Amino acid sequence: MTEHPSSSAEQPAEQPAEQPPAEQSAEQPAEQRPEASAARPSLTPPADAVPPVRHPEAPAPGELIEPHYEHCFGCGPTQPHGLHLVARAGAGVEVSAEFTVAAAHQGGPGLAHGGVLVTALDESLGTLNWLLHTASVTARLETDFRRPVPVGSTLYLRARADAVRGRKIYCSAEGRLDSPDGPVAVAARALFLQVTLDHFTTHGRPEEIKAALENPDLFKRARAFEVNP
């Protein structure tokens, strides 16, 4: 009687299942993923970036930096629930700022809302425009939250421009709790992009744009900081 080999002996050894592309990229750093790098610009200055240069007419170190717009949620004095952030020019291309967390800034009970803390970082980074004498807006901002910030506490912020390449400004900031040397509560890296006045006149609400353009001081300042893309 002839023996027939079992069917399992004729089957090739099972190959490991191929890992789906999404799983293959899951452990890669975000900025190394092809689909991410196309959509989100890197926060790391490229090799040909250059050090930022403080403008000769920038505010002197220690000088208060005036609000760029009175209704700004970050620095505007007429914004009732704003941060009322106060900034001063530092040495080099650096600014320091501070704001006190009010009850209107709560997220969790008795704690600053995370979005408010991001706003404080963003506002301090935007204040670097005064030192560079340019108009730029946030293109990307990445924040690390390191500890809770209670209502009634003061956040001491420091922002600096790290590198420039064309219209791109690479910068970073941190916020310390209750003193300039206190524990770091939040930190950020950001990419700002230089723009012209058209950026605001094209996208802003007409009423506010009209009022801003009728303010001679604000209009003069905007024109002085304007750059060509």
PLM features per residue range, with description:
Residues H81-L83, V93-A97, A135-L141, S153-L155, ...:
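A generic structural signal for short beta-strands and their flanking turns/coil linkers
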